[in-house]
C-alpha cells in the first residue's frame, strides 16, 4: 500500500485540531450549534485551509454520516455547468441521512468558472436551497460575481504565520521520527509562502532522503538552490573574484537548471543572514530589485546575473577600503 501524503495523513478532523483561524472557527461553530447555516464562501491563497475547514465543518455537522451528506466537486475538473447541475440535482433529490436539516455541496475552484457559469450556479443554489447548502472555495473573491457573494457568508483565509507553521511541522516531523532543524523550517516557510500544504509536501520529500532535515536537504528536495551555493557566490563576488563567481553561476544555470528568478529569490533569502551592515544590505537589496525588474521585462538572464556579480565586486571593494586604517600624512 502506498504511503499517504502527509498533508492528508495529518489533515485536521475537527475544529480543535485546526491551527489558527480562530474567528472562522468561532462563527462556524455557531452554525453547527444552531443547525442553521447559509451558503458559505471561503476565499484565500492556496494551502490556507479552505478545503480542510469545509471538510471539518462537514464532520462537525453530520458526524459519522458526513460522507453520505457531502458532495465534493471541482469546477476545473467538471465538464461544464450542466454536469455540475445534474450531479447536484441527483444528490439533492434524496433526503439527508441522519437528523441533518440539509446536505452539503463543496465546490472547489469556483473562481475558475466563467461569469455565465456562475450565473447558472446561482440559480442552482436557489433551486436547491431548501435542503442543500453550498460551500464555495476560491483563491480570488474578486472573480466571484456579486449575486453569489450576496447569498453567502464570506470568510477570508490567510497564509499561516511562521510560528504556527513551525509548530505544526515540528509535530509532524516528530510523529514521523524525523529531526527537522530550525534553519530548515525557515527555508520551508520561505519557499511555501505560508501555503501549509506545500510546506508539508516539501518536508515529506526532504525526509524521504534524510532523517535529519537541514536547510540544504530542504533546498535539494524543493529543487531550489542550496544555501551553501548562494553563500559561496556571494563571497566570491564580494571578494572580487568575478571570474570564479561567474563560473559558479553558469554551472548552476546550465548544469543544474537554476532559473534567473530563482537566483534572485535565493539571494534575497540569504542576504538577511549575511554578516553585512544594514547600509550594505540595503544597497544589495536595491541592486537585486533592479535586476529582478529587468528579468521580468525579458532581459537576458546570464547578462543580468553577471552584472549583479560585478556590482557585488564593487560593493566588496568599498567594504574593504572602508576597513583599512587611514593613511598617515
From Swiss-Prot:
Disulfide bonds: none annotated. Gene3D superfamilies: 1.10.8.60, 1.20.272.10, P-loop containing nucleotide triphosphate hydrolases. CDD domains: AAA (cd00009), HLD_clamp_RFC (cd18140). InterPro entries: AAA+_ATPase, ATPase_AAA_core, DNA_pol3_clamp-load_cplx_C, DNA_Rep/Repair_Clamp_Loader, P-loop_NTPase, Rep_factor-C_ssu_arc, Rep_factorC_C, RFC_lid. The keyword DNA damage does not apply. GO terms for cellular component: DNA replication factor C complex. GO terms for molecular function: ATP binding; ATP hydrolysis activity; DNA binding; DNA clamp loader activity. ATP binds at residues 44-51. Keywords: ATP-binding, DNA replication, Nucleotide-binding. It comes from the Archaea. One of its GO terms (biological process) is DNA-templated DNA replication. Heteromultimer composed of small subunits (RfcS) and large subunits (RfcL). Belongs to the activator 1 small subunits family. RfcS subfamily. Part of the RFC clamp loader complex which loads the PCNA sliding clamp onto DNA. NCBIfam families: PRK00440.1. This is Replication factor C small subunit 1.
Amino acid at each position: 500500500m502506498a504511503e499517504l501524503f502527509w498533508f492528508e495523513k495529518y489533515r485536521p478532523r475537527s475544529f480543535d485540531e485546526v491551527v489558527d483561524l480562530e474567528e472562522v472557527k468561532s462563527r462556524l461553530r455557531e452554525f453547527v450549534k444552531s443547525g442553521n447555516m447559509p451558503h458559505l464562501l471561503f476565499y484565500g491563497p492556496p494551502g490556507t485551509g479552505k478545503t480542510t475547514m469545509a471538510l471539518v465543518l462537514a464532520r462537525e455537522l453530520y458526524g459519522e454520516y458526513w460522507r453520505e451528506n457531502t458532495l465534493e466537486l471541482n469546477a476545473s475538473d467538471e465538464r461544464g455547468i450542466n454536469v455540475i447541475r445534474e450531479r447536484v440535482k441527483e444528490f439533492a433529490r434524496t433526503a439527508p441521512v441522519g437528523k441533518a436539516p440539509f446536505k452539503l455541496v463543496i465546490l472547489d475552484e469556483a473562481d475558475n468558472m466563467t461569469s455565465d457559469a456562475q450565473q447558472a450556479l446561482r440559480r442552482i443554489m436557489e433551486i436547491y436551497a431548501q435542503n442543500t447548502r453550498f460551500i464555495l472555495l476560491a483563491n480570488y473573491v474578486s472573480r466571484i460575481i456579486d449575486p453569489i457573494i450576496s447569498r453567502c457568508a464570506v470568510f477570508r483565509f490567510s497564509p499561516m504565520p511562521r510560528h504556527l507553521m513551525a509548530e505544526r511541522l515540528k509535530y509532524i516531523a516528530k510523529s514521523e521520527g524525523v529531526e527537522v532543524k530550525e534553519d530548515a523550517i525557515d527555508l520551508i516557510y520561505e519557499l511555501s509562502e505560508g501555503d501549509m500544504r506545500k510546506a508539508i509536501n516539501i518536508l515529506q520529500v526532504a525526509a524521504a532522503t534524510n532523517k535529519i532535515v537541514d536547510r540544504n536537504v530542504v533546498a535539494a528536495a524543493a529543487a531550489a538552490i542550496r544555501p551553501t551555493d548562494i553563500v559561496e557566490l556571494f563571497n566570491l563576488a564580494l571578494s572580487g573574484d568575478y571570474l570564479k563567481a561567474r563560473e559558479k553561476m553558469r554551472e548552476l544555470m546550465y548544469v543544474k537548471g537554476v532559473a534567473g528568478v530563482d537566483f534572485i529569490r535565493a539571494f534575497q533569502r540569504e542576504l538577511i543572514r549575511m554578516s553585512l551592515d544594514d547600509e550594505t544590505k540595503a544597497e544589495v537589496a536595491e541592486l537585486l530589485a533592479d535586476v529582478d525588474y529587468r528579468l521580468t521585462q525579458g532581459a537576458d538572464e546570464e547578462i543580468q546575473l553577471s552584472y549583479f556579480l560585478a556590482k557585488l565586486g564593487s560593493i566588496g571593494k568599498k567594504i574593504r577600503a572602508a576597513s583599512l586604517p587611514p593613511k598617515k600624512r
